[in-house]
Amino acid sequence: MGKRYQNHDDLEEINVEIEVQGLASISKNIKESVVGLTLPQVRYLVDAYYQMQGARMAMENQARSLIQGYDSTVDGAKDAHPLAIQWTSKAFRNDEGQIQKMLDKYTDSIPMGRYLKSIKGIGPVLAAGLLAYLNIDKANHANQFISYAGLNDNNNPWLGRDGSAKLIKELKTMFPDENPKNLSDDVFIEICRRTHRSFESVRLYSQVREEKTNERKGYTTWDSLQSYLAMPPYNKDLKTLCYKIGESFKMVSGRESSLYGKLYRQRKAYETIKNDNLEYADQAAAILKKKNIGKGTDAYKAYSKGKLPKAHIQARAQRATVKIFLHHVFDAMYFEKYHIDPPTPYVLEYMGHEDMIYPEVDYKEFF
């Protein structure tokens, strides 16, 4: 049996080992190097952080199953893990921390990064992710940010393999005289009408690609169009990041000084009332019909009563809050680039009336 964690001295031993063998601290040169990172490089670090975090959490869950009742927070806990296993966990956490420090340095070097980190619930990793994925040069209004983040699924749903195949079959019937090796703009226009995608995006991203170079060839076939339509019409990584932002706003919802935490609470209460009044009964019935939900689950009990489960209501509240936040992020990026206010102030039809919702922090102080 390996040596077990007994006292503070043993914990110090683990920390010393990490100092010697792990990435206990990164040098000043490494920290400074992040200032000039490209956006793809920032995305790499953000992805690396979350991949490392996911691996560490899976590893810790597996370690907990080795001994029952393990609690690493209790000094002198009985039946604790051997030092070797504790060292591994702390080394993983340490590596996460080093990436976080680098992203903190990176976001400190950018006014928009400093603005984002001034918002409660947004730390250096989330801020860096937003900077890496959102490009004001490619957006004319906030809804484009929201769509790119996959938060407008009702307007532009992910068709998937089956949905795209069905749509292509319908289009072939509608346009029987089309050249199958070079589709016309008429097909693209119909795609835009049905999916709410932009004409430029459909025509560009549906083109056949060169196998070796992956370069676009300038024409679209039925097969290349179907492949394009089968892909998510949003950035999956950004959507995941926005989910994490929503979770973070939920965690700070107890702070009165947190605007987005407060909006989350209000929206959750609003959604709960609508749910209790069975205003989502049609959605509940549709989900129950479409998905194979275990009859013994709380979700099934809710759907069968014409209601959405609590987790679903919570997710709706988080998405609504993140949408408001993304509007504010767009406004801030627009002001930073053009030094004027966005053309149309964001007015939200919210809680049954229209309110102007101002950002938690005045972004003009940072630019």
Language-model-derived ranges and their functions:
Residues 134-141, 152-153:
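Catalytic Zn2+-binding segment of zinc metalloproteases
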